[in-house]
Amino acid sequence: MTLSTLTSLMIMTLSYMIPILIAVAFLTLVERKILSYMQARKGPNIVGPFGLLQPIADGVKLFIKEPIRPSTSSPFLFILTPILALLLALTIWTPLPLPFPMTDLNLGLLFLLAMSSLTVYSLLWSGWASNSKYALIGALRAVAQTISYEVTLAIILLSTIMLSGNYTLSTLSITQEPMYLIFSSWPLTMMWYISTLAETNRAPFDLTEGESELVSGFNVEYAAGPFALFFLAEYANIMLMNTLTITLFLNPSFLSPPSELFSITLATKVLLLSSSFLWIRASYPRFRYDQLMHLLWKNFLPLTLAMCLWHTSMPISYAGLPPA
């Protein structure tokens, strides 16, 4: 491999990673602004005009601080897990059409599901490597919650594949040209949205970070740079899940607008959906753990299985009918 090829690959990778990281940084500012206005206060408004430079100031502050590691922790895993969390969070973006994917995979949805399952390891290892009971309990909660809700996410994706007829994410744009899939499969969309909240450990499903019980959950021993990496990974996953929701159910190719407007339309919809995540955080109290599991295993799982059977059987049933 020549030097020019390596350079071009590096530039391509950075050109898709840096905008995601910038968007994630400003999502934290949007969150603080929305929460502050909902609580009748101003929020960040000192650093830069209207507080716009606050995320940059926070990032600089965190990365120049000295990282502290507990003396009894596992040194290698303790440092590796935040890096792994951010690396996985950025890698999952590769097959998403924005409007063109970084890598056009035939099994894009399967890749997304497999990579999002791997994020469980970073949570579990961080809790175990910290050698703290609070961190370990938080990590075990996160693992149980994430694995549980991935079941419904996978079944909903399977139903969506039945509707679109392909695992490729680009096909969903063509499928949704006449009508958004949200109209034909709104129960799936509602369950998908709630499952993405649980998958990203956001309120009201933030059982892993219950301040009154576990101080800060799996990342309680992390400070400075490693904590910032976990923070970036969490918000990158939120944006990823919202982008995937838009791609699956509210694809930007509605009424075939010019391709130049695709990215703007997608970004606007993702921002609105991310704002609804923050609105829910400000509005709802935290679920009890048994309620969280009850919602999935006794409500969502039977419903999603029934919907999946419905979406599978309908094309087969209609295939035997004579043409009108």
UniProtKB/Swiss-Prot annotation:
EC number of the protein: 7.1.1.2
Chemical reaction(s) catalysed: a ubiquinone + NADH + 5 H(+)(in) = a ubiquinol + NAD(+) + 4 H(+)(out)
Record-level Gene Ontology MF annotations: NADH dehydrogenase (ubiquinone) activity
Domain of life of the organism encoding this protein: Eukaryota
Compartments, record wording: Mitochondrion inner membrane
HAMAP family, alphabetized: NDH1_NuoH (MF_01350)
Family, similarity comment: Belongs to the complex I subunit 1 family.
Biological function: Core subunit of the mitochondrial membrane respiratory chain NADH dehydrogenase (Complex I) that is believed to belong to the minimal assembly required for catalysis. Complex I functions in the transfer of electrons from NADH to the respiratory chain. The immediate electron acceptor for the enzyme is believed to be ubiquinone.
Protein name per UniProt: NADH-ubiquinone oxidoreductase chain 1
Encoding gene (name): MT-ND1
